[in-house]
């Protein structure tokens, strides 16, 4: 019985922590047509409070980097990798034993997508990220992405 209670407390605490990290970052998406069959997909993270979100290239082992994974779509071609647009902070963090790269308040991630034909489709996938403040880190979170393009 004692083990069941401890397990339930652990599960509840984990669920609350994941919910906190999803509230710490709000995602907005926008699509801009660059040329015929070429689109710029912007994925903007608005980071609340004193939290910071780690970059795609964190700089050290330890904190979870931001990772975008897109679902294969036979109608699209990803042109290059996701680019970060924002003011990166490079700071030594003793807990990680080195210099880390992260963003405060906001960062925009940009992916260029080319369509194989003039059709309406979507860019789908997920983004995994981790946020911390000066006192704590929240568990890594995963948010689904679905952005309509073309047409």
Label for each model-derived stretch:
Residues 1-23:
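Bacterial Sec-dependent N-terminal signal peptides
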Residues 20-151:
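Extracellular/lumen-exposed scaffold segments
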